[in-house]
Amino acid sequence: MLFNKCIIISINLDFSNKEKCMTKPYSIGLDIGTNSVGWAVITDNYKVPSKKMKVLGNTSKKYIKKNLLGVLLFDSGITAEGRRLKRTARRRYTRRRNRILYLQEIFSTEMATLDDAFFQRLDDSFLVPDDKRDSKYPIFGNLVEEKVYHDEFPTIYHLRKYLADSTKKADLRLVYLALAHMIKYRGHFLIEGEFNSKNNDIQKNFQDFLDTYNAIFESDLSLENSKQLEEIVKDKISKLEKKDRILKLFPGEKNSGIFSEFLKLIVGNQADFRKCFNLDEKASLHFSKESYDEDLETLLGYIGDDYSDVFLKAKKLYDAILLSGFLTVTDNETEAPLSSAMIKRYNEHKEDLALLKEYIRNISLKTYNEVFKDDTKNGYAGYIDGKTNQEDFYVYLKNLLAEFEGADYFLEKIDREDFLRKQRTFDNGSIPYQIHLQEMRAILDKQAKFYPFLAKNKERIEKILTFRIPYYVGPLARGNSDFAWSIRKRNEKITPWNFEDVIDKESSAEAFINRMTSFDLYLPEEKVLPKHSLLYETFNVYNELTKVRFIAESMRDYQFLDSKQKKDIVRLYFKDKRKVTDKDIIEYLHAIYGYDGIELKGIEKQFNSSLSTYHDLLNIINDKEFLDDSSNEAIIEEIIHTLTIFEDREMIKQRLSKFENIFDKSVLKKLSRRHYTGWGKLSAKLINGIRDEKSGNTILDYLIDDGISNRNFMQLIHDDALSFKKKIQKAQIIGDEDKGNIKEVVKSLPGSPAIKKGILQSIKIVDELVKVMGGRKPESIVVEMARENQYTNQGKSNSQQRLKRLEKSLKELGSKILKENIPAKLSKIDNNALQNDRLYLYYLQNGKDMYTGDDLDIDRLSNYDIDHIIPQAFLKDNSIDNKVLVSSASNRGKSDDFPSLEVVKKRKTFWYQLLKSKLISQRKFDNLTKAERGGLLPEDKAGFIQRQLVETRQITKHVARLLDEKFNNKKDENNRAVRTVKIITLKSTLVSQFRKDFELYKVREINDFHHAHDAYLNAVIASALLKKYPKLEPEFVYGDYPKYNSFRERKSATEKVYFYSNIMNIFKKSISLADGRVIERPLIEVNEETGESVWNKESDLATVRRVLSYPQVNVVKKVEEQNHGLDRGKPKGLFNANLSSKPKPNSNENLVGAKEYLDPKKYGGYAGISNSFAVLVKGTIEKGAKKKITNVLEFQGISILDRINYRKDKLNFLLEKGYKDIELIIELPKYSLFELSDGSRRMLASILSTNNKRGEIHKGNQIFLSQKFVKLLYHAKRISNTINENHRKYVENHKKEFEELFYYILEFNENYVGAKKNGKLLNSAFQSWQNHSIDELCSSFIGPTGSERKGLFELTSRGSAADFEFLGVKIPRYRDYTPSSLLKDATLIHQSVTGLYETRIDLAKLGEG
C-alpha cells in the first residue's frame, strides 16, 4: 500500500502573504452579534475600498477583487449545562455501582462458601441467555427455587419486610438482595440527624411554615388544634377537599388569597401565584413537577428572593405529609413501615386491577383490549409498560369511565391519586435515607445472630448507605481535572470508611469557596458579596431610597429625601420590619415633619429591597446593639458568607466555632441551621472600599449622603466629576501576562458563551483586516453589539399582555369602550390587533385626544398624530410610555418640550384618572405634567440626548477595553496610554434612526448582507460625528476622560442641549420642529474650527447608497469541528440520549452499544450518532462479490466517538473502513464550502459516519436584490401588523413589482439553488397571483408578520432547505443535494475569517502532480 505517497491535508492554512501597506487612513466598523459579526472598512470619504486578493490553490484563478465589507456567520456558542448534567448523572451511577461493589466485597467470602457464582449471575442477569456465563436464573440458579421465591416475595419490599420482622435464619442471598436494594435506592439526605417513621412531625413542620409565612407576609395566623390538621391531611379524601378543610381552620383567610394558594401546594395540587403577587402572567407551581425548581426560580425572579424561605418551608411540610402517607400502616409492630406501606400499595393495586378489568370487560371487548393490551394508548398497558405517566393514565381513565354508571369507586380513588399506584413513583423522592437505614438495622440485627460477619461489619454496611461526598469536596478525580478541586492528605483509593483520613475537608472547602464565588463585573479582581450580605442589602436599600421623592401641601415641587431622612427611615422602618411600604414613608414624613397631603415617587406600594438578613440575625442573636455596631461588620459578613457557601451543617458548625467566644452555643446552633442562597453582582470593595479622590467618600457614603444631587449607583460610577469611573476602568486593564492569550481573556468576561464567541471572532477579524491593510493600524474601530435574545417568561409574553392589561384597567375606570368600540376592519380585538400603537393608545386613552379631550374616531386612527411627550430631539424613546394619540401634535401648546401649562391644567384630572386605573404609568403622568415643575432643565435635556448616543452596557465596554489594550499599548512619560487607535462605541439606535431617515431599509429575510451594512453605517456615523465635533471624543472614545474646563464644561447647559439635539441632524437637509416649523441646513456640513468638509448630503449619501447596493459582500460561514450533535435544533451529546431497542433482523440501523462490550444487535443502543467532520478520501475500494478494485474519490464521515481513533492513526482508521491504496485525505470541517462549475455554492454540513452516501448539504449562495425590491419587501413584511395605511398603500401601489421579483427569484433558483421541480410548482401557483389578496401575497413572499418563516425566501436563503407555503400551495423541502453532487466539477474553497483570503482546490485536478 502506498502509505509513503499519501498526502493528508487539513484545510486550516496560514494566509501569510504580505500585503502592501495601506497609504490612506481607514476605520473599521463592527456589528457583533451572538451568531454573526458584520465588518466594514471605510476610508475618510466613507467609501469601502476594494483590493485585488491573491488566491492560493490549484485553480486557474489567481486573483479576485473584493470589497472590504463582509460578515462572518457561526453557530451560536452554547452553555455547558448539557455536559454538566450528563457528567453529574455519570458520577451518580458510578457511585451507586461502587456502593454495590463495596457491599459485595463484604459479603464475598461468606457468599463463596454458599454460592460462588451468585454475584456473577446477578451481573449477567440482564444479558441474553447466550451471553450468560452461568444459569439464566439469577438468584438460585434453578427454576424451582426461583419460582418459590417469586411466589413468596412478589416485590423486593415483601422480602425486606420479611427479613426485618422475622427471627428465622434467612438465605444469605436474600439478605444481600434486601441490603443491596436499600443501598442502591437509599433516599434523600435533606433531613439531618436521627429520624424515624415515628417522629415525622407534621404538626411541627406546619408550625414552622406558619411562623415563616407570618414573618414574611406580616400576618398573625395561628392554629390551636394542630392535631386536627394532621387528621385532615392523613384522611382518605381528595386533595381539594383537604385544602378546603384546612382553610376552614383559619376563618379570616379567603379562598382566593395567598394562604389558600400555599395550601394547594402543600396538599399536592397546583397553585397559581399570579394574582397574589400582581403579576401579568400565570405563575403556576406544583411540587411534584420535575420543573418545580426552575418554575420557582422564575417566580422568585419576579417577586424577590425574600420569599424563598416560605416556599422552602411549604415544600418541607409537603414532603412530611407525603412521607406520613407512606408510613401510615395498620401493623404497628413491624420494623419495616416503608416496606409495609409498599406491600399495601401492591395489594391494593392487585385488587383494584381485578375490579377494573371486570368492570371494563362488561363494557366491551374492544374497550378492554384498548385499555389492557394496546400500549400505544394511555391505558393500563401503556401505563404499566412505562410509556404513559400516572397523570395521563388518570386523565384517560376519567374520560373513559365518566360515560358509564357504577364507576364512582374508581373515580374517587383517581381524584385522591390513589388508584393503581406503582411501586416506584415520583413521591418516593420524599423518603429520607433514615427510613431505609431503620429497616437495614432491623435486618442486620436479626440476621447477625446467624451470620457473625454481619455483626462485625454492621458499621461498615451502614456507612455504605449513609455516606455521601460533601458537595463542597466535589468530584474525587485526581490530576488536572477541570471539574475537581478536592485536596487530599494521602494518595490512596477513597472508600466510605477512609474518607476523613484521605480528604482534607477544610482545605477542599476553601477551594470550593474560591471556585464558587464569581467576580465583580466592575472590579474583575474582586469577589462578589453574597446576595444576603448585610452590606449588600444596606447598599440596595439606600440605592432605592436615594431616588424616592415626595411632595406635600404647600410644596411647589417634588423633593428628594435628605441624608437624615434616609438614615431615619432605615433605622425606624427597615430595621423594624421586613417589608417597608409607601405608607411607612408617608407616616414618617407626617409624624416627624408634620407634612400633609403627601405623594411619593420612586416607590410603588413597597420597596423592592429590604434588610431581611438583619431581621434573621436579630431573631437568632437577639442583640440589636451588636448588629448595629459597625465594628462587628466583618464578623457578620463572614457568618453570612459561610451560611451562603455551605449547606452541610457540620461544616457550618466547624467554621462558626471560631466565634464561640462571642456567641453562646445556642446562638451558634441556630445559626448553623440557617442557610442563604444566591450571590450579588458587586463586591465589598466597590460598594464601600474604593473612594473618590476629592471627597474621600465611598459609593455607599454617597448613597447615604449626596447633598442635593441624590445620585444612585449607576450615576455615581459614570459621573465624570467623580473618580469612581476612572478607577473602575483602571481595574479592568488586562495584565501583560494575559494579553497573549486573548481567548482566555474573552472567556473570563461576564456574559453568555454566545456573546463571548462573537467577541472572540470580532477580534480575529480586526487582526486580519489590519494584515490586509499591510499592517497599518486603523484610525478608529467602531463597535456595536447586538442585545442578546431574552428568553425569560416575561420577555416571551410581553406581546400577549396588552389585551389583559386593557381589560383590567378599563374595568377599573368603568369604561366599556373595549367592547363597544371596535374598528370596522376588525371582527374582534385581540393581542395581534393591539400591536398597532394607534389602536392600543386609543384604548389606553379611553378614546380621547390626550391634549384636548375630544373624542377620536376609531376608524380614522391613521389620520391622527402620535406625539412623543419627550420630543425625539431629546430622547429616542418609542415606548408607549412616551407616546400619546392626538388629533394634532400642535395641541400640546406653546411648549416645544412638553404639553404646556395651559394643557396640563385642563387635562390633569383626566390623566390622573388614567393613572389610577393603570392605563398610564407614573412616569408617563410625570412627563405629561412636567410643565408644572418648570419643564425640562437644560441639563436634563443634555443628559437625555447623551444617553441615546453613548453605549453604556458593561459588556460593550469590555470589548472596547480589549481592543484598546490591543492597539494602544504604548505609554507616555506619565505612564498613560498613547491612543493612536480610537475605540468608539455607539448605540444601535443611531444606525436605526439613520436607516429610517434615509429609507435605507433592512430586510433580514433576503440575505445576510445586513450585518455588514450595519457595521458600515456605524463606521460612517461615528466618523462623520467626530469629524464635525472632534471635541466629542471624550464622550464616545474608550479611555478618554473629559478634562477640566473641557468642551463640555465650557458650554452652558442651554448650548449643550442645542448641541446634543442637533448631532444627528448633520445628515439632514432640513429639520421639522414640533411646532410645525421647518429649518433648512447647509448642503455641506463642515467642521467650524478647521473648515474641513464633513458631510455632503448629496454625494456622501449617494456613496452610502452605493455601498449598500454592492452585490459583492464577503459572507463566510465559520467552519468548525463539531463537539456535539443536534437533536431538533438543540445540542445533544455523542448520540441521542435515550436507548433504542435492538434493531429488527436485516435492519441497516446503526446503533452505538450502551456499553462497549454489549452488542447493539442484541441489546439495542444509541441512535443518532453525532458527526464531527468529514474527510475526502482518494484511493481504492473492493466492490461487489468479486471484490473488484475500483478507484474512488468520496467522503467519509468521522463521528465524535471515532475522532480520537482517527487522530491516532488516520491511515489505519480508513483502511479498516475498507479503503486501500490511499493517495489523499482532505479533512473537511462542518460548513466546508464547495463551488460548482455553474457558480452555485454548497456547504457540507455533515456526512453520516455510518453511511457515506448520505449527508446534509446546505445552500451557499446569497441572493442580491435591488433597492426597489428591498423597499417593497420592507413594507410587505409590515402590512398586517398595523392599521397604519402607509405600508399597505405602498404595496398596493407597487403590486406589479411582485411579478418582476418572482421571476427574478425563480431565475436565481434555476441558476444557483437547483430546485427545478419546486420552481415548476411555484410557477404554476403564481399564475393566479392577481386573484390573491395583498395580505396573502405579502406573507407568501416574505413570511407572515411576527413569524421567523421567510416565505419564498426559504427557497433562496443560505442554509438547509425548508418547506414553505406559497399562495396556498405547499412547497416541499428540496432534498436532491447528495454528497456525490459535490464531487462533480467542484472546487473546494477555504476562506479566512474575513473571506478576503482564499485557497481553492479543484477536485478534478487532484492527483495531478
Swiss-Prot record:
Has 2 endonuclease domains. The discontinuous RuvC-like domain cleaves the target DNA noncomplementary to crRNA while the HNH nuclease domain cleaves the target DNA complementary to crRNA. Mg(2+) 1 binds at D31, E784, E788. This is CRISPR-associated endonuclease Cas9. Its cofactor is Mg(2+). Disruption phenotype: Plasmid transformation is restored. Residues 792-949 form the HNH Cas9-type domain. Residues 1137-1150 have a biased composition (Polar residues). Endonuclease activity on target DNA requires Mg(2+). Signal peptide: none annotated. CRISPR (clustered regularly interspaced short palindromic repeat) is an adaptive immune system that provides protection against mobile genetic elements (viruses, transposable elements and conjugative plasmids). CRISPR clusters contain spacers, sequences complementary to antecedent mobile elements, and target invading nucleic acids. CRISPR clusters are transcribed and processed into CRISPR RNA (crRNA). In type II CRISPR systems correct processing of pre-crRNA requires a trans-encoded small RNA (tracrRNA), endogenous ribonuclease 3 (rnc) and Cas9.
